Amino acid sequence: MPRMPDSSSLFDELQDLATEQQNPHSTHIDTASVEEILRVINTEDHKVPIAVRRELPHIAEAVEIVVEAFEADGRLFYVGAGTSGRLGVVDASECPPTFGTDPERVQGIIAGGREAVFRSQEGAEDVPERGAQALKGQGVTENDVVCGIASSGRTPFVVGAVEHARDAIGCPTLFVTTIPREELDVDPDVAICPVVGPEVIMGSTRMKSGTAQKLVLNMITTAAMVRLGKVYENMMVDLRRTSEKLVERGIRTVMMVTGVDYDAADAVLTRCDGHVKTALVMILADVEVDEARRRLDATDGFVRPAIEGDE
């Protein structure tokens, strides 16, 4: 079994982390009223989007890397532990119903495996080699992208995965953390570092750090999917109609974009197996199913040029 780090050196390392500092604005919350506790949390939460905004140039770099990988049939792997790992799993699991992607396209890997999504697996994050093994288990190749997520920037499972991806696999690497960039030990292709400051509860990185990570992951996958033609105007047009809500959303989308009524939208969607993009092209370009599909194939799934016949 790999040797664990010396406890005294780990103590020294942790006490200096930005995520482990005491927040001077919340030291009184153990004696505060409920409303004051909430006010303190809300005030601190307002700092999160500002910190994320400062990282937009780096997030844009990450999006370009992900888009390039997707265009080459590559995949995106989020790797995290605890809250960070769960956030990766959540973002990955939402891509298929939202954007119609294959579940393999964006995947979340969490230290401790599936059980850790629902219940903390203490110690699962402490061995770097396990991160590397997790990537091997998923068959990660140089065509994929590995994105580590760790509030502290030092979680061994995550660092081990990112270093293995960079050095052994040779694929692009990203890292999302909430410590200053200069304190990051790992060297990814792109580091995204929204520094949100000490947590309201010292060290509870499920709070501001987790919120910042969720915003960043939302941006990465959403912007990438927009660039891949998964959105028309600001609407989901590649959604999978896997629930009653999504069936109705598909009909409503066709109605809103084309101006047809409910029955007409439903009828066209029935003719094209419920595919919203095809329905839009059929109605707006006044073509039949086969021609609409041909146009979408010719434009790599982008609706606007398919409607205009700009192939």
From Swiss-Prot:
| Signal peptide annotation | none
Q: Does the keyword Translocase apply?
A: no
The record's section on InterPro entries has:
Etherase_MurQ, Glucokinase_regulatory_CS, MURQ/GCKR, Reg_chr_condens, SIS_dom, SIS_dom_sf
Q: Tell me a Gene Ontology molecular-function term this record carries.
A: carbohydrate derivative binding
Named in its record, the pathway it takes part in is:
Amino-sugar metabolism; N-acetylmuramate degradation
Give the Pfam families listed for this entry: GKRP_SIS_N
Instruction: Report if keyword Lyase is assigned.
Output: yes
Q: What family does the entry list? A: Belongs to the GCKR-like family. MurNAc-6-P etherase subfamily.
The function of this protein is: Specifically catalyzes the cleavage of the D-lactyl ether substituent of MurNAc 6-phosphate, producing GlcNAc 6-phosphate and D-lactate.
Q: Which PANTHER family match?
A: GLUCOKINASE REGULATORY PROTEIN (PTHR10088:SF4)
Q: What extra comment accompanies this record?
A: A lyase-type mechanism (elimination/hydration) is suggested for the cleavage of the lactyl ether bond of MurNAc 6-phosphate, with the formation of an alpha,beta-unsaturated aldehyde intermediate with (E)-stereochemistry, followed by the syn addition of water to give product.
**What is the protein name for this chain?**
N-acetylmuramic acid 6-phosphate etherase
Q: Which gene encodes it?
A: murQ
